């Protein structure tokens, strides 16, 4: 099993000694060669002062002059070490101190020279923990005696030698290729790579999904060993397993929801719902397929899923967490017995959850419902007929009463919604952490309300049991993240006041999104607001969740076939049922119900055996960092594909004129978000030939000296598509001469104290642009 230094070091937690044998087991070192390689790594880390050996075991050394961070480099070679702590200062690392580290690598950075009043401390990459670029996109070129690959990512300032074994690289010269890194640079030896796929003559000739999957190193296929492991899984449910579980098939209607043509069985049906009306309350059943039963911990399929972390959606192409063959065994399809974990929420007539319990179960789904079909039926619930008629009561109570009540509770707590035109593949709040509503399909977001409140209850149950958990949180945005959109809201006279020096709270987003509702540009504004949110992160402890307005205690559990973290939670919940102690001592006649809310505040003992609890804590600590990295990669890849799609559409419409909203103004030009496609481009100041334009930072505007014509944040303008850089997703726009003359409404007199400095800075920026600094040469599409 391959592993990084970061993975190895993640097993050193809480200043505890770790035996070499323990690491061999955890890292899958079975052969003599693998054990020897591990020992070499341990010896090297000991010599570097990262580990210390005590009584035959190892411990991690904590040093104040060494910090862990991820490298972020620019195309000019400037590199900063970005620490995981949001409040930590970024560390500048000179090019000569990178120690062969590349952009994106996780590293240990060490202070090699203390700072003075005039100079910052000098830092050096002490150790590369994890490589971020196991493969890359490049262009092949022929040198005197071999072939080389030039990375397309201009932040990777090197060339790779190409291995020319049984490959006709001459045919690939000047073509876009996917290169697998065989050897990273070491001493005088340059990096070595191997061409694994020729994508096309250039980026535009290649398939966009190929570009994205190769760029982000997404695994699309499965090894023969993985397929063999899949085939060895049981194809039928063992009779003994059925006897251990609660049957949820006789008394309740079970339905699943999905997107697809009527009558078509949809893959990966992970969740089924049931509903039972009671006096002044409901019992809502949420039944989740039991992936944990089939995927044993540390099995080959589990290791591969852990490495993938999450399913990545590239439109029709999906990079799944598990092989497709698992669908037939686990998916909750109609009229088939399936193993599940069944959760029951008691919801009162105010939308508050008053009861929670869960069971290992067997379920049989009665019917699969299509979102669009249900939305149409709910518009005229009295006339529901055909196959939907038996479920009319369930749908009416679920979407007209229960989910709206739960939503009301969430909004009263301080949470908010944002509108979107595209549906998320997730049933819950998704990676951005906010419930997105669709005007055409509002039941999707209503169903998400139910998933969110279930996941909150699961987190509360884990905390009440005192067992380790994998929690989901979201960091609040910084004031500077909202600067432009708050100024934009002010220019649009929305009347929303936000103190950017203070804490940003969810109510700020609620007020902004509510203010956008009445504006023609609301789609653009909601899109911009969503882009200010940080994606969710995993934690090994309860953490606040910004968009959902939870102080602490939230997790994910409804998608164990699509997110590895959900599978981990499923295993923990099942472990409670099989290994949990429901009473302090065996002498006690009665115990608590560990699977129900009634045990909360009743437990004063260790529910799990201490050794097991300690092992789980260590595993979760090791897991968190990897899962967060994979979620970020998935988010980047999905955004990348969307950006390529938009760039392709805009390139095909070069020369056309579009209406858009000015969303940012700088000294070098202004950014325009085009209404039709939500694509953003840059109108460079050099393209404004009718006047000399000056940047006014206070008004967020570019103002013509003679004409007083202004391009101001929040103005609507017509722009023409001049050119598009497809791979970099940069759109160059030109302004059509229809900008408003705002001199009557705004004070554009040259009375700023920093006027001369501003004008000089404008000139400097422009000079830098002409000298070839293309960092501002176009807008990256978000």
Curated annotation (Swiss-Prot):
Pfam families for the chain: CSD2 (PF17876), OB_RNB (PF08206), RNB (PF00773), S1 (PF00575)
Domain S1 motif: 655-736
Stored SMART domains: CSP, RNB, S1
Alphabetic keyword roster: Exonuclease, Hydrolase, Nuclease
Domain called RNB: residue spans: 270-579
Gene3D superfamilies reported in the protein's UniProt record: Nucleic acid-binding proteins
CDD domains, per the entry: S1_RNase_R
InterPro entries to which the protein is assigned, alphabetical: CSD, CSD2, NA-bd_OB-fold, RNase_B_OB_dom, RNase_II/R, RNase_II/R_CS, RNR_Ribonuclease, S1_domain
Presence of the UniProt keyword Hydrolase in the record: yes
Presence of the UniProt keyword Nuclease in the record: yes
GO molecular function: exonuclease activity; RNA binding; RNA nuclease activity
Family named by the database record: Belongs to the RNR ribonuclease family.
PANTHER family: DIS3-LIKE EXONUCLEASE 2, RIBONUCLEASE
Functional summary from the UniProt entry: Not known; control resistance to the carbonic anhydrase inhibitor acetazolamide.
Protein name according to UniProt: Acetazolamide conferring resistance protein zam
Annotated source species: Synechocystis sp. (strain ATCC 27184 / PCC 6803 / Kazusa)
């Amino acid at each position: 099993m391959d592993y990084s230094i970061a993975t190895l070091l993640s097993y050193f937690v809480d200043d505890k000694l770790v035996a070499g044998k323990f690491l061999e087991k955890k890292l899958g070192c079975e052969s003599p060669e693998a054990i020897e390689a591990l020992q070499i790594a341990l010896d090297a880390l000991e010599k570097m002062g990262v580990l210390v050996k005590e009584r035959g075991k190892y411990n991690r050394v904590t040093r104040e002059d060494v910090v862990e961070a991820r490298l972020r480099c620019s195309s000019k070679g400037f590199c900063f070490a970005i620490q995981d702590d949001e409040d930590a200062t970024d560390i500048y690392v000179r090019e000569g101190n990178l120690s062969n580290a590349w952009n994106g690598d996780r590293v240990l950075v060490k202070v090699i020279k203390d700072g003075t009043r005039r100079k910052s401390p000098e830092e050096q990459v002490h150790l590369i923990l994890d490589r971020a670029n196991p493969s890359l996109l490049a262009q092949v070129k022929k040198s005197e005696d071999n072939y080389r690959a030039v990375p397309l990512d201009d932040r990777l300032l090197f060339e790779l030698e190409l291995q020319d074994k049984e490959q006709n690289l001459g045919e690939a010269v000047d073509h876009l290729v996917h290169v697998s890194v065989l050897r990273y640079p070491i001493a005088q030896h340059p990096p070595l790579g191997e061409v694994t796929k020729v994508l096309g003559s250039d980026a535009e000739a290649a398939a966009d999904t190929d570009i994205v999957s190769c760029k982000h190193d997404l695994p699309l296929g499965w090894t023969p060993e993985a397929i063999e492991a899949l085939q060895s899984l049981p194809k039928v449910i063992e009779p003994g397993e059925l006897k251990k579980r609660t049957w949820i098939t006789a008394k309740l209607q079970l339905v699943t929801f999905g997107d697809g043509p009527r009558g078509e069985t949809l893959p990966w049906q992970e969740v089924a719902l049931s509903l039972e009306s009671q006096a002044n309350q409901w019992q809502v059943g949420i039944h989740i397929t039991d992936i944990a039963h089939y995927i044993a911990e540390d099995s080959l399929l589990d290791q591969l899923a852990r490495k993938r972390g999450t399913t990545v959606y590239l439109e029709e192409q999906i990079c799944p967490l598990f092989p497709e063959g698992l669908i037939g065994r686990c998916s909750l399809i109609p009229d088939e017995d399936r193993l599940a974990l069944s959760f029951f929420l008691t919801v009162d007539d105010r939308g508050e959850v008053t009861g929670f319990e869960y069971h290992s179960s067997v379920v049989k789904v009665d019917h699969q419902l299509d979102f669009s079909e249900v939305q149409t039926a709910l518009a005229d619930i009295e006339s529901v007929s055909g196959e939907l008629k038996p479920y009319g009561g369930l749908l009416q109570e679920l979407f007209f009463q229960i989910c709206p009540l739960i939503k009301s509770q969430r909004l009263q707590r301080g949470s908010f919604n944002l509108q979107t035109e595209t549906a998320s593949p997730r049933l819950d709040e998704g990676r951005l952490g906010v419930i997105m509503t669709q005007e055409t399909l509002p039941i999707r977001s209503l169903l998400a309300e139910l998933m969110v409140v279930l996941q909150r209850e699961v987190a509360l149950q884990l905390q009440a049991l005192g067992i380790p958990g994998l929690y989901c949180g979201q960091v609040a945005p910084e004031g500077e993240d909202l600067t432009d959109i708050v100024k934009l809201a002010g220019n649009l006279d929305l009347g929303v006041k936000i103190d950017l020096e203070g804490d940003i709270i969810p109510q700020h987003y609620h007020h902004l999104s509510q203010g956008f509702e009445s504006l023609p540009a609301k789609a653009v504004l909601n899109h911009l607001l969503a882009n200010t949110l940080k994606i969710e992160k995993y934690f090994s402890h309860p953490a606040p969740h910004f968009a959902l307005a939870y102080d602490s205690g939230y997790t994910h559990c409804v998608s164990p076939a699509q997110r590895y973290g959900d599978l981990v939670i499923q295993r923990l919940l099942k472990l409670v049922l099989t290994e949990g102690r429901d009473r302090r001592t065996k002498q006690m006649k009665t115990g608590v119900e560990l699977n129900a809310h009634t045990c909360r505040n009743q437990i004063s003992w260790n529910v799990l055996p201490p050794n097991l609890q300690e092992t789980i804590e260590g595993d979760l600590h090791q897991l968190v960092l990897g899962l967060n990295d994979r979620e970020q990669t998935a988010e980047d890849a999905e955004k990348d594909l969307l950006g390529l799609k938009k760039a392709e559409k805009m390139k095909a419409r070069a020369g056309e004129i579009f209406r858009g909203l000015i969303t940012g103004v700088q000294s070098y030009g202004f950014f325009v978000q085009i209404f039709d496609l939500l694509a953003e481009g840059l109108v460079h100041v050099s393209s404004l030939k009718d006047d000399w334009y000056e940047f006014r930072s206070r008004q967020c505007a570019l103002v013509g000296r003679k004409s007083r014509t202004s391009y101001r944040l929040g103005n609507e303008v017509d722009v023409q598509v001049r050119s598009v850089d497809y791979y970099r997703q940069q759109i160059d726009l030109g302004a059509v001469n229809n900008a408003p003359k705002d001199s009557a409404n705004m004070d554009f007199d040259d009375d700023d104290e920093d006027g001369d400095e501003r004008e000089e800075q404008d000139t400097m920026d422009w000079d830098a642009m002409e000298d070839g600094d293309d960092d501002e040469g176009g807008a990256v599409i978000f």
